[in-house]
A protein has these predicted regions:
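Conserved hydrophobic alpha-helix
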Residues: 197-204
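Activation segment/activation loop of eukaryotic-type protein kinase catalytic domains
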Residues: 217, 222-241
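Conserved structural core of kinase catalytic domains
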Residues: 94-185
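Activation segment signature within eukaryotic-like protein kinase domains
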Residues: 193-194
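Catalytic-loop of the protein kinase fold
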Residues: 205-222
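ATP-binding glycine-rich loop module of kinase domains
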Residues: 38-83, 90-91, 97-127
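Juxta-kinase regulatory segment immediately upstream of eukaryotic protein kinase catalytic domains
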Residues: 1-31
Length: 241
């Protein structure tokens, strides 16, 4: 476990929101459904521009005003992602931990960063505080400290690989793209995507994880690799026995 500071003046900080918009065909769209009921999600960056991650990841932190509702969801996601390591088509958890925001912290409005001004309004740079950071193989320590940390004002978080691919929801529903399908999928691709999703869910179920939040916006399509990738396991159950 590491104790580090979250501070946009020097070190790691929270940049643009990732939970208010989706991308497809190199275009961004404000999607209200992308917002989570239990967490906020921001781009996690460092002032130096250098991080130990291959690219800037996503920082998913429990909503400070929904703690009672969010607690069981975070517990499920910690357990599921820690135990599904190595499963293909899965967005991996890179690290996890707890954030204790400074007493004067003001959380940003949930605004899609579709302009520079909106990006400035929606970013999390003013969220500062102390972080207890754990590696994935230390997840048992996270679970053991979970209740006590929350009672002491800490908010659980996950650091996840950021999805950059086309969101499958926008490839299949033209409601937000003004009637345009930004990238047509062939029938073969649609069938392949369906098989990949079923194969992933079957393997997860065999390991003890049940996925219960079946929305297209939880899937991304990697055109280059012809691969579908899933996010968001907090609406799920970990039942290894």
């Amino acid at each position: 476990m590491q104790q580090i500071r979250l501070d946009s003046q020097d070190g790691f900080y929270l940049a643009e929101p990732l939970d208010t918009w989706l991308t497809a065909g190199q275009h961004d769209f404000a999607i209200p459904e992308a917002g989570g009921s239990s967490a906020r999600v921001f781009l996690y960056k460092h002032t130096s521009g250098k991080t130990p991650y291959s690219r800037d990841p996503a920082f998913k932190v429990m909503r400070h005003d929904k703690i009672s509702y969010a607690k069981p969801l975070f517990l499920e996601e910690y357990n599921i992602l820690a135990n599904l390591r190595g499963v293909d088509n899965l967005t991996p958890m890179l690290q996890a931990g707890f954030l204790k925001p400074d007493s004067n912290t003001t959380w940003p409005s949930e605004i899609a960063p579709l302009t520079k001004q909106m990006e400035k309004q929606g970013q999390g740079v003013n969220i500062k505080g102390e972080m207890a950071l754990f590696e994935v193989d230390e997840i048992e320590d996270v679970l053991a400290q979970f209740e006590e940390r929350i009672q002491d004002g800490w908010l659980p978080f996950l650091i996840l690989e950021r999805r950059w691919e086309d969101n499958l929801y926008l490839l299949c529903d033209a409601g937000y793209t003004r009637g345009n399908f930004v990238r047509n999928l062939s029938m073969k691709q649609v069938l392949d995507i369906s098989v990949q999703i079923c194969t992933l869910l079957e393997e997860a179920h065999n390991r003890g994880a049940s996925f219960l939040d079946h929305k297209l916006l939880h899937y991304y399509w990697n055109e280059f690799r012809q691969k579908v990738i899933i996010i968001d396991w907090n609406i799920g159950h970990w039942q290894p026995n």
